[in-house]
Each structure stands twice: as structure tokens, then as C-alpha cells.
């Protein structure tokens, strides 16, 4: 062989091979599904390229994949006449993993084999799965349109290096030969191989054929028998398709090893004609938050594959949705640029977005447990929706889930409809608080009066929550109100103040003025409040002022943060406030006021500019 060289696998491939062989062995038959799935993709790509260059078919447009085995040599071969690969493509596809962040992710994986096997599936391991059952894999391939002498040979035992060389290959496409390990003889059994193909590959449009050998007149006659239905699943009638087939098709297009949570298969006729098959995965991909993460739907036009990851059909906050769309209204030569500016695309995107939101609403209604699985995996992504998609804001809001004071649990299980159904008589607003953690939200002094009145408060502690609530202004005609902001509706909830209390408050007016004079412009205002029961003081912000959590978001993003001017609210019934008001010594008075302000700021922000000064002051006052 000419041009032979031995090369080392990229380190991530070595790690993946090791993990895969050990984690996926209990489900080893999936290697055949993966290799046939790759062959199907190769056929799709050839069909697409041949639209503009029919010569790529080289006189053979009947695309298929053929499976054969040799019991004497203990080999199993999967051969397709798809698009094939040149030498550079072989090295790129079979020697490296092109996903950024792969190395650190693989290093973080532990010894939980069940979990590992699910996560490994997300790499679209395809080809490498051959090493689960083979101790050596040989590949012979030639790219469509290349000369026969530009064929490529690739071989590896999957241990750290591979050999690549130039060969002559008359027919285009890829032929993968697995040299089976000892003990894997089941994959040399005709019936066993047929049953695996039927189980996993009925849904793909590419014919899968198995070799038949018959003795006729003393000679061995070879023929090929089609095993699968070879009809694209989404073109079939829904009533004819079993759940298992939908599940297997999902695994084929998503390169996932787990079943989806739910799906929606629809054929639309009329102004626009298209078929969509949309899936909600049961597990988030490991790189969901990676900027390079590819997402979007497979796009077909009149059943011809056009592209993977067509992100123009789904808003970013639904980037976890997998599936395909087959349109009759787009041109076969459509490009990503054309899709970007197409009215057809915009209309399809709008319809598919509504379809997904309806699918999620149905899942939430029919199976709360499954919806909780969805929420744990993708809730943070869905929370981007209110800012991104004003037109569907109400539908998105129905799908949101929160922790709340009603459940006494950090689990985000409360819907806005649940909250509204429990609102007290006369309650006009939906109350919420944002904080760095569930514990900080739950124990915030801002909740004291509302707890006393039995009014539910939503406890928001994800980083995105404050940003989301800037866009989510109302639900079911009821405004959202942060309990950390000054608001008349909260003060109104306080019990009617009796005449004696009013007199006592009037007597405290000089104290309030004294505090204002001391603090100056460090606070926006000083006032007495009846929204506290156990806490001496809190700080709040005006409705139009930037909140504490929003300021933290700005700071985390490296942006300049305007100074937040707080309202300092004092509880006139608290013993510490009364003691401070009775303190005549100015130095001692200053220490008490500073302590109360620091306590309030610490409860609100979780940090202080000078924590050592706070500790010193507190210790000093404790012993005074």
C-alpha cells in the first residue's frame, strides 16, 4: 500500500474508547445500529451533493447499505455506497473528536457505568462503537467523484494508534470490517444479525440488505435481501408507527442512547405543506451551555436531506429540541443564508415553536413526574424564553416552575397557575424574591410579614431569575412584585396600626431624622416599616432602582455597576431599634446604626465591603 503511515489517536479518542468499551458492553448490539445510522447519513449527504452534481452517483443512484459476515475469518462487514471519504476526512473523522470541551468533560466522568453509558451516547460515538465487539477494525473508503486510486485504507486495534494508507477502490462509499473479539460469535449468526437490523433500522429510508449465500449446481450464488422497511419514518401514517419505532428513530437522529420524554409527529397541509417530528430529550447534552454547541433540526425538502442543525426553525430557548422538518415549500438548493431571510422559514419557526410549547404543556398536564424530569434538565434554558419571545410569553410562563414558601422544599414544582389558585382574598400581586441560594431566599427578612399573613412567595435562586423577571411582568392579569422592593401593597398587608402605636411612631420621628443625618447620602431614605416581625431592619430598593441581584449579574458579566441606593427600613417594635433610639451618646449611637445597616446589607447582598469592621463593631457592642 502506498502512502502508509501510523498516527496516534487524539487523547480524547483514547479516553472515549476506553470508557465506551467498558460502559456500553451490556448493550453491545448498538454498534450495528450506530454503523448503519452512519451509512444512512452518508447516503443523505450524497443525495444532497448530487442535486447540484449528478455525476457523483457514478452511474449508481440506488443507495443502500449491505451487511455480510465471514464465519471462517470471524469478520462482520458493513458497506455503503454513500458519499465516502478522502484521506484528510478519514483522519479528521476517525482520529479526532471535533467537539470543544470534550477533554475536560471526559476527565470529569466517574465510575458510574449506567450514567457514563448515557453520557457517552451524546458524543455520537457511531464509528467507535465497533470496538465494543471488535479487537481490530478495518476501513476501506473512497469519496464520491474521486478517482479509484484515491481510495483510503484505515485500520486500528483501538488502543492508541491507527494506520492509514492509499489504496485503489473501484466503487465509492465506505466499507467497515470488524474483526470480532473472542466470545462475540453471536454477530456471525444470520438470524441474530437480522433481528438487530429489524429492531434498530426499520425507521431509516436507506435499504439495509444482508448477504444470502445459496448453493446452485455446485456453485455458491450470492444475493442480497432487504431486511428493513426502508421508508422514512416521518412519511408513514402515525397510526402505523409503534412507540418503539419513534424511540429508535430519535436515537438515530439525536445520537442519544436514552428514550425521549415525548414527541410530536404532524403533517400540515394548506398554505404551507410540511411534516415535522419533534422530540424532547430526557437528558441535557453535556455541552448544552457551550457556545459552540450545535442545535437545530434536521432539514429535508421533499424528503431530500438538506442539512443538520438547522437552527433557524427553533428559537434559542428551545435549543434542546431534536427532530426534523420536511418542507414542500423550500427550494432544494436552499442554503443557511436563504433560510435566514425566508418568509417560509419565519412561518415554520412560528408554527414549530407553538407546537413545542403545546407539547410541553400537554406533558406537564398528563405526566407531572416526566415534566419534572424535563424541568430539571432544561428549566434554566426555558427561562430564557420570556425575554426572547414576547409573542409566546404567556404560554412560556405557564411552563415555568418555582420553589415557594408553600412547599417548604427547594424543588421547583410550583406553577404560576398553582400560585394564582392559592392567592388570598384581596391579594392583587404575585410575590417573589430573588437570591443567591434557596436558603437565602427562604430565610430572607423580606418574607416575614407575608409569612405571618399566610401569603405565598415564590423563591427564585437561579442566576437567570432576576434577568427573567425583568421581562416577565404579569401572569393572568396579575403583576409580579419583588418583596425586596418598596411597595405599597406589602405595607397595606400590615395590621391596622392602633392609636398608641401611631403615637409611638410619632415619638420616633426625631430618631429617624437622626439616622438620616448620620448616614447622609449613603442611603436613599430612612423610614419605619411594619413589614418586619423578627428582624430589626432591612434595605429595599425603589421600583425603578436596579435590584441587588441584577447588580450582581452585571458585576459577574464584567460590566460597570451603578451604585444601588437603598431605602433603610427600621422595625419600630424591635428591641434593638428601641435601644438604638434611646442611646444618647453620639459615638455609641453611630455604632448601633452602623451595625443595623450592616446587618440589613449583609442579609440583602450576602457580602459586606468591610466584614472585619462589622465583626469588630458587633463584638464591641456585645460586651458594652
Swiss-Prot record:
Keywords: ATP-binding, Chaperone, Cytoplasm, Nucleotide-binding, Stress response. GO terms for molecular function: ATP binding; ATP hydrolysis activity; ATP-dependent protein folding chaperone; unfolded protein binding. It is found in: Cytoplasm. Residues 1-336 are annotated as: A. One of its GO terms (cellular component) is cytoplasm. The keyword Lyase does not apply. Its main location: cytoplasm. The keyword Cell wall biogenesis/degradation does not apply. It comes from the Bacteria. InterPro entries: HATPase_C_sf (IPR036890), Heat_shock_protein_90_CS (IPR019805), HSP90_C (IPR037196), Hsp90_fam (IPR001404), Hsp90_N (IPR020575), Ribosomal_Su5_D2-typ_SF (IPR020568). Residues 337-552 are annotated as: B. SMART domains: HATPase_c (SM00387). Residues 553-624 are annotated as: C. Homodimer. Molecular chaperone. Has ATPase activity. HAMAP family: HSP90. Belongs to the heat shock protein 90 family. This is Chaperone protein HtpG. It comes from Salmonella paratyphi A (strain ATCC 9150 / SARB42).
Amino acid at each position: 500500500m502506498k502512502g502508509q503511515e501510523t498516527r496516534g489517536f487524539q487523547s480524547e479518542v483514547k479516553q472515549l474508547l476506553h470508557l465506551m468499551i467498558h460502559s456500553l458492553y451490556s448493550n453491545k448490539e448498538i454498534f450495528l445500529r450506530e454503523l448503519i445510522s452512519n451509512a444512512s447519513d452518508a447516503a443523505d449527504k450524497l443525495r444532497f451533493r448530487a442535486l447540484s452534481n449528478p455525476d457523483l452517483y457514478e452511474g449508481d443512484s440506488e443507495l443502500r447499505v449491505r451487511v455480510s459476515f465471514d464465519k471462517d475469518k470471524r469478520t462482520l462487514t458493513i458497506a455503503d455506497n454513500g458519499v465516502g471519504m478522502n484521506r484528510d476526512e478519514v483522519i479528521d473523522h476517525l482520529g479526532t473528536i471535533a467537539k470543544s470541551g470534550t477533554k475536560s468533560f471526559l476527565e470529569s466522568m466517574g465510575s458510574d457505568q449506567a450514567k457514563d453509558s448515557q453520557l457517552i451516547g451524546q458524543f455520537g460515538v457511531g464509528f467507535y462503537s465497533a470496538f465494543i465487539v471488535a479487537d481490530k477494525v478495518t476501513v476501506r473508503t473512497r469519496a464520491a467523484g474521486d478517482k479509484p486510486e484515491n481510495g483510503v485504507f484505515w485500520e486500528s486495534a483501538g488502543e492508541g494508534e491507527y494506520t492509514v494508507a492509499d489504496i485503489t477502490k473501484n466503487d465509492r462509499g465506505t466499507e467497515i470490517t470488524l474483526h470480532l473479539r473472542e466470545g462475540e460469535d453471536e454477530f456471525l449468526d444470520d438470524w441474530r444479525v437480522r433481528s438487530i437490523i429489524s429492531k434498530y433500522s426499520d425507521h431509516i429510508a436507506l435499504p439495509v440488505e444482508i448477504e444470502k449465500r445459496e448453493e446452485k449446481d455446485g456453485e455458491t450464488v450470492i444475493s442480497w435481501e432487504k431486511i428493513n422497511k426502508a421508508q422514512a419514518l416521518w412519511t408513514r401514517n402515525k397510526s402505523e408507527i409503534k412507540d418503539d419505532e419513534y424511540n429508535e428513530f430519535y436515537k438515530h437522529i439525536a445520537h442519544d442512547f436514552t428514550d425521549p420524554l415525548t414527541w410530536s409527529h404532524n403533517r400540515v397541509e394548506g398554505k404551507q405543506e410540511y411534516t415535522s417530528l419533534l422530540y424532547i430529550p430526557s437528558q441535557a447534552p453535556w455541552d448544552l451551555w457551550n457556545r459552540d454547541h450545535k442545535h437545530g433540526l434536521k432539514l429535508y425538502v421533499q424528503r431530500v436531506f438538506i442539512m443538520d442543525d438547522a437552527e433557524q426553525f427553533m428559537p434559542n430557548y428551545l435549543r434542546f429540541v431534536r427532530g426534523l422538518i420536511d418542507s414542500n415549500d423550500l427550494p432544494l438548493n436552499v442554503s443557511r443564508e436563504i433560510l435566514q431571510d425566508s418568509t417560509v422559514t419565519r412561518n415554520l419557526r412560528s408554527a414549530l415553536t407553538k407546537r413545542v410549547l403545546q407539547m410541553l404543556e400537554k406533558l406537564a398536564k398528563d405526566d407531572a413526574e416526566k415534566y419534572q424530569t424535563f424541568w430539571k434538565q432544561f428549566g434554566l434554558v426555558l427561562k430564557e424564553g420570556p425575554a426572547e419571545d414576547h409573542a409566546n410569553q404567556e404560554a412560556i410562563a405557564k411552563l415555568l416552575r418555582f420553589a415557594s414558601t408553600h412547599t417548604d422544599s427547594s424543588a421547583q414544582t410550583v406553577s404560576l397557575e398553582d400560585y394564582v389558585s392559592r392567592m388570598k382574598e384581596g391579594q392583587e400581586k404575585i410575590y417573589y424574591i430573588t437570591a443567591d441560594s434557596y436558603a437565602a431566599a427562604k430565610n430572607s427578612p423580606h418574607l416575614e410579614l407575608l409569612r405571618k399573613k399566610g401569603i405565598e412567595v415564590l423563591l427564585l435562586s437561579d442566576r437567570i431569575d432576576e434577568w427573567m423577571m425583568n421581562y416577565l411582568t404579569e401572569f393572568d392579569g396579575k403583576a409580579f412584585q419583588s418583596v425586596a422592593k418598596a411597595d405599597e401593597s406589602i405595607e397595606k398587608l400590615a395590621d391596622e396600626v392602633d392609636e398608641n402605636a401611631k403615637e409611638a411612631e410619632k415619638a420616633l420621628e426625631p430618631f429617624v431624622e437622626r439616622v438620616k443625618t448620620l448616614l447622609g447620602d449613603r442611603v436613599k431614605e430612612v423610614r419605619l416599616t411594619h413589614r418586619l416581625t423578627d428582624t430589626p431592619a432591612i434595605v429595599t430598593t425603589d421600583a425603578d432602582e436596579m435590584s441587588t441581584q441584577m447588580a450582581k449579574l452585571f458585576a459577574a458579566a464584567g460590566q460597570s455597576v451603578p451604585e444601588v441606593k437603598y431605602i433603610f427600613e427600621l422595625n419600630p417594635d424591635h428591641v434593638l431599634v428601641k435601644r438604638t433610639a434611646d442611646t444618647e451618646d453620639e459615638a455609641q449611637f453611630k455604632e448601633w446604626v452602623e451595625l443595623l445597616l450592616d446587618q440589613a446589607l449583609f442579609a440583602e447582598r450576602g457580602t459586606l465591603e468591610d466584614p472585619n469592621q462589622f465583626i469588630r463593631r458587633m463584638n464591641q457592642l456585645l460586651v458594652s
